[in-house]
């Protein structure tokens, strides 16, 4: 049988390549890094995590946790490696990003059915089956080709990555260990603020200079990765109801709740690096150091990486994609990852998993898989196909995408757990019916 091309070896492309190869089909995997880098990536490794190192909630009362469990049950490579290189993060799944991407790169490069090409692809394949997983930073030449193929203008907004600081530079006499509502282990470092400290920080944040933006469309910002300075501009209390909310965080040393709290999450397994949760930013690097050192406990913080901003380009999925992730008018071409309009690491990986499975089905002239709407995988794909196309915006997985339960349950945690149980039961039924191992 012919090989399937996978263009892009980010989260979605890496997962798609794995799913294709595990079914005995050869893969031609193309990745332009490190020959041609993007504004946001730092390495040539596959599945590099460029924003946070968190893969969101781990529990089955969390939609992202459900999606991850569904992927595990379909032998997701990225979930397997994420579990292998997990770092403590309370109720979330976070990974050592370097070990994570290095292991995925190694496994794919050494796979006997995967041929890796380190080169930029500038045109869409004219024959055969292909998965396009070029991500939010799709190279300009290929982006133009996609526009010609789909007839749709690409949309753009800002994504932002948070700064990382060293543990040894954090003042542990001011910061304290805790997880919100004592959920899970106390894996977060928390920097408490008084009202006076918060207001000083807030006003300096508003005055701080942002870096020059080149080649981006201004003004379109996805809520889930909004720069902290953009959020602050919405009002003085916005941050205290967002990433700096103090609820559920009590400093055991004082027994008091602070006016605001900045949380820091482990960036690596060794626990030597921490990222500032919710502090994606486009401030100039000098300004980041000046303003973020106003946070109690970070007065002498050593920044090993400053926050950066980068472009995100995505399709108007309802107009051009099917729920199997293929193009409506060119069904031999599949798309996966953030370019489809899913948002988030886990969601991108999930789309790659489904696109990879379906690329093989198309090659074998079998009906493609449309996962049940009761599953997170199915709900996400059906959202892309069935949303209104006017002002379509990226979406993360959430329980609102899944059908409600037949019996109303008021307790949110219990309700979500039952939705997850239903989803996993439906997935097992679907796997049995479709012969998925």
Curated annotation (Swiss-Prot):
GO CC terms in record: cytosol
Keywords, alphabetical: Cytoplasm, FAD, Flavoprotein, Methyltransferase, NAD, NADP, Transferase, tRNA processing
EC number in record: 2.1.1.74
Zinc among keywords: no
Gene3D superfamilies: FAD/NAD(P)-binding domain
Keyword NAD: yes
Enzyme class, first EC level, given as a word: transferase
Gene Ontology MF: a single term: tRNA (uracil(54)-C5)-methyltransferase activity, 5,10-methylenetetrahydrofolate-dependent
Catalytic activity from the UniProt record: uridine(54) in tRNA + (6R)-5,10-methylene-5,6,7,8-tetrahydrofolate + NADH + H(+) = 5-methyluridine(54) in tRNA + (6S)-5,6,7,8-tetrahydrofolate + NAD(+); uridine(54) in tRNA + (6R)-5,10-methylene-5,6,7,8-tetrahydrofolate + NADPH + H(+) = 5-methyluridine(54) in tRNA + (6S)-5,6,7,8-tetrahydrofolate + NADP(+)
Cofactor list: FAD
Cellular location(s): Cytoplasm
Broad class of where this protein is predominantly found: cytoplasm
Amino-acid positions noted as binding FAD in the UniProt annotation, renumbered to this chain: 8-13
Pfam family, one: GIDA
GO biological process: tRNA methylation; tRNA wobble uridine modification
Family, similarity comment: Belongs to the MnmG family. TrmFO subfamily.
NCBIfam families per record: gid_trmFO (TIGR00137), PRK05335.1 (NF003739)
Physiological role: Catalyzes the folate-dependent formation of 5-methyl-uridine at position 54 (M-5-U54) in all tRNAs.
Descriptive protein name: Methylenetetrahydrofolate--tRNA-(uracil-5-)-methyltransferase TrmFO
Organism in which the protein naturally occurs: Desulfitobacterium hafniense (strain Y51)
């Amino acid at each position: 049988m012919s090989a399937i091309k996978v263009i892009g070896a980010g989260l979605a492309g890496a997962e798609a390549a794995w799913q294709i190869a595990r079914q005995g089909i050869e893969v031609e995997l193309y990745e332009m890094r490190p020959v041609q880098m993007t504004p946001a990536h730092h390495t040539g490794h596959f599945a590099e995590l460029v924003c946070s190192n968190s893969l969101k909630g781990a529990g089955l009362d969390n939609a992202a946790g459900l999606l991850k469990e569904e992927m595990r049950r379909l032998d997701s490579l990225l979930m397997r490696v994420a579990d292998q290189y997990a770092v403590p993060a309370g109720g979330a799944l976070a990974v050592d990003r370097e070990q994570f991407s290095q292991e995925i790169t190694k496994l794919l490069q050494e796979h006997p059915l995967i041929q890796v090409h380190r080169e930029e692809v500038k045109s869409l394949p004219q024959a055969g089956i292909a998965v396009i997983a070029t991500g939010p930073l799709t190279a300009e030449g290929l982006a133009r080709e996609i526009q010609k193929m789909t007839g749709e203008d690409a949309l753009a907004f800002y994504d932002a990555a948070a700064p990382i600081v060293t543990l040894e530079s954090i003042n542990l006499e001011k910061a304290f260990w805790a997880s919100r509502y004592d959920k899970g282990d106390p894996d977060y470092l928390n920097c408490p603020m008084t009202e006076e400290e918060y207001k000083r920080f807030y006003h300096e944040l508003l005055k701080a200079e942002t870096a020059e933006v080149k080649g981006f469309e201004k003004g379109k910002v996805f809520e889930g990765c909004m720069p902290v300075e953009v959020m602050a501009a919405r009002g003085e209390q916005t941050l205290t109801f967002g990433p700096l909310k103090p609820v559920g965080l009590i400093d055991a040393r004082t027994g008091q709740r602070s006016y605001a709290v900045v949380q820091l999450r482990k960036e690596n397994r060794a626990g030597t690096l921490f990222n500032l949760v919710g502090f994606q930013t486009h401030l100039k690097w000098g300004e980041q150091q000046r303003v973020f050192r106003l946070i109690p406990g970070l007065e002498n913080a050593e920044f090993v990486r400053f926050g950066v901003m980068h472009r995100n380009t995505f399709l108007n999925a309802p107009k051009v994609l099917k729920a199997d992730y293929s193009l409506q008018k060119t069904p031999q071409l599949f798309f996966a990852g953030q370019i489809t309009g899913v948002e988030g690491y886990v969601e991108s990986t999930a789309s790659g998993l489904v696109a990879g499975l379906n690329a093989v089905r198309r090659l074998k002239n079998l009906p493609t898989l449309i996962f049940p709407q009761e599953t997170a995988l199915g709900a996400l794909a059906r959202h892309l196909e069935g949303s209104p196309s006017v002002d379509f915006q990226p979406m993360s997985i959430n329980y609102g995408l899944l059908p409600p339960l037949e019996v109303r349950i008021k307790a949110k945690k219990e309700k979500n757990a039952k939705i997850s149980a239903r989803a996993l039961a439906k997935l097992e039924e679907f796997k049995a019916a479709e012969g998925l191992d």
